Amino acid sequence: MLFRSEHKDFAKADEVRTFPNGQLELLHVGGSDIGRLILQPGWRWSEHVKPLAGTDLCEAPHFQYHVAGTLRIQMADGTSFDAVPGQVTALPSGHDAWVVGDEPVVVVDWWGASNYAKS
């Protein structure tokens, strides 16, 4: 199968999903989805996305590049860590996350974006 070149821009996302204190900009490119999450200070998955997901923890696995801000991630087993700009995280399902500090968090997500915050 031959692929054709594609060039897309998050400023002209194929789909935008908004939720309290955040949004997901989704691109359909190369036969896959890639998302940019922008999360405002005060955002927390268990408060702002849990009602949409209907699960106690985020069940979407993620493979993310962290562009801006600090995101604290807490796994189901209670372990937690902070993800900061320049880092890459691979998260299995079963986690909560929240913005730490006054700077918005921006992440680019290759795995969990297609179903994220989908009502």
Language model features: what each stretch is:
Residues M1-I38, S46-E47:
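A short, N-terminal "cap"/entry segment at the start of jelly-roll beta-barrel domains
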Residues L39, T55-I73:
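Short, conserved beta-strand element in jelly-roll/cupin
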Residues H28, W43-C58:
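Catalytic core of non-heme Fe(II) oxygenases with the double-stranded beta-helix
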Residues M75-G94:
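Short acidic-glycine-tyrosine-enriched beta hairpin
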Residues A11, P41-W43, G112-S119:
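Glyoxalase I/VOC metalloenzyme domain signal
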Residues P92-A117:
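Ligand-binding loop in jelly-roll beta-barrel domains
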